[in-house]
Amino acid sequence: MKKQEVVEVKLNKTIYGGQALGKLEDGKKIMVWGGLPEELVKVKITKNKRNWAEGIVTEVIEASKERIEPKDQDSYLSTSPWQIMNYDFENNLKRSLIIDQFAQHAIELNLNDFTAPEDPYHYRNKVEFSFWWNNETEQIDLAFFKRGTHTKQPVNETSLALQNINKVATTIRDVLRQKNIQARDLKTLLVRCNQSEEVIAELYVKEQDVDIQISHTEVGAVGFSVHYSNPKSPASIKTKTLFTSGATKLEDKILGNVFTYSVDGFFQVTVPIYEQTLKTIKEHTDPKKPILDLYSGVGSIGLCVTSPNQNLKLIEIDERCVNEATLNAKKIKPEAEIILSSSEDAVDHITNEQTVILDPPRAGLHQKVIDRLLKVKPAKIIYLSCNPATQARDIALLEQIYKISYAHGYNYFPRTPHIENLVILEVVS
């Protein structure tokens, strides 16, 4: 079997990570994008390893009753491969995947609740577009990278984004077309929108001598800027700012607290459901106990769940996040202590009398953090995770002295395989 070969596969189930799992004729496992359990499909092989293969569905021979038409026919595999499934099926699947991850560590998780937005579309407040040159029309298009490739798929919009993001992005595209800007000079377009529907857009270019000066009002935004970004780096990093018009930062309210943030900074992409999570976290904190917020980012958890007289300490490794947390703390909780450090290098700040909040990256907790928690035994740990697999791994270690008192799953990113999970741990007396 060779790469790009098309084979017929019966799919069995959806696995953690988002693909459907099936078997090839020789018994080798194959993980497939664009398929659902119980479907018979034709699959184009994209990877062929010794013990497993990957592929993308090219034709559905026998469809699942849960299959629906994707809203973004041409680009859903790039951004949101679960557009093909019924929304109730998606939410039930995410619930079961959380439980399965804990079961792999011999933890029988009782998921107390699972929260998902009513509308699975138009929720993202931040989108990054690439660019593509159309040889037929001889003009640029917005684009996303095709999943698992370096090739691009032209798009007009994405159904995941807030409507004003699509509107501003296509307007900028049209202005760039009028100026005859070439795709080879452009890197990405980053567009962000707050809950007041104000938009700021940042255009990243590969050449310093590109002359693009567009008023923010011309594209319907409150701010627009152009930045040279080193073309040797795949990421959209600001090497030099070439042009700015209007605002450079946005404001948003989270549980009544005003946060200021940069377009390219870290801020929640789905604020309404994040607020619901924070309300639940606050219900599980003791206002009389100090809070330590590890992996705190811009501080939105700690700053939103503490009471006026409650002691708060934030630990964060990213200097830009710390700067934004400091700026926001001045307005919300001036006495908060904010420390620039990795959590594993700040374990001495973990003490017995605190409520400890954990919101680590996908890799989960550092072993030093786990060891310190087991040593000093804070009475309560609140663990929010964007990766239930590593969360379950960490909690299996913490179960030496902790028990799960509450668990709540969240669908922050509908139509994608991403899952958030909140677990409350209490020390066993």
Describe each PLM feature range.
Residues 121-125, 195-198, 417-418:
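A short, glycine/Asx- and small/polar-enriched loop/turn
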